[in-house]
Regions:
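Short, well-ordered beta-strand segments in beta-rich or mixed alpha/beta enzyme
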Residues: 6-12, 50-90, 115
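Glycine-rich beta-strand-turn "strand-cap" elements at beta-sheet edges
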Residues: 1-2, 39-65, 94-126
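Short amphipathic alpha-helical segments
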Residues: 17-45, 90, 94, 98-99
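Glutamate identity and glutamate-enriched acidic tracts
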Residues: 7, 20-26, 47, 77-80, ...
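A short, structured loop/turn motif at beta-sheet edges
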Residues: 34-36, 77-80, 122
Length: 126
């Protein structure tokens, strides 16, 4: 059996779709996934980011300050549980009939980043 781990998901929200995306996540996707058993431990939104060079100097990479990034974290007890929950959520009629297409209208699916991470012993999130 595998160890518990976290999944960090990063999405780029389309311009002029931020409010709609945030409401869709809050009122539809998050409650639906929690009902299916997903342990969602954090949801975040950012409109900018900074890159810091090796000498500690901030570089001006995102000059337009229009990054529109949505980040969320889910926890799984094992790889087996993750596979089971993915199936329950993403193969369900509710997802396929009412949510899947809507997601593609609001975020850039080609830019999705997903990290599977193990919590370190000194982390507050376990």
């Amino acid at each position: 059996m595998s160890k518990p781990f976290f999944e960090l998901r990063i999405y780029k929200v389309f311009p002029d779709k931020v409010d709609e995306w945030l409401e869709f996540m809050e009122k539809t996707i998050v409650p639906f996934q929690r009902l299916k058993g997903m342990d969602i431990v954090g949801n975040f939104y950012s409109e900018s980011f900074d890159l810091i060079s090796n000498d500690g100097v901030k570089t001006d990479v995102n000059r337009n300050n229009d990054d529109r990034t949505y980040i969320w974290i889910r926890k799984f007890e094992s790889k087996e549980q993750m596979k089971d929950l993915y199936k329950k959520v993403y193969e369900s009629p509710e997802w396929l009939d009412t949510m899947n297409d809507k997601v593609g209208e609001l975020i850039d699916r080609k830019s999705i980043l997903v990290y599977q991470m193990e919590s370190l012993p000194y982390s507050l999130i376990q």
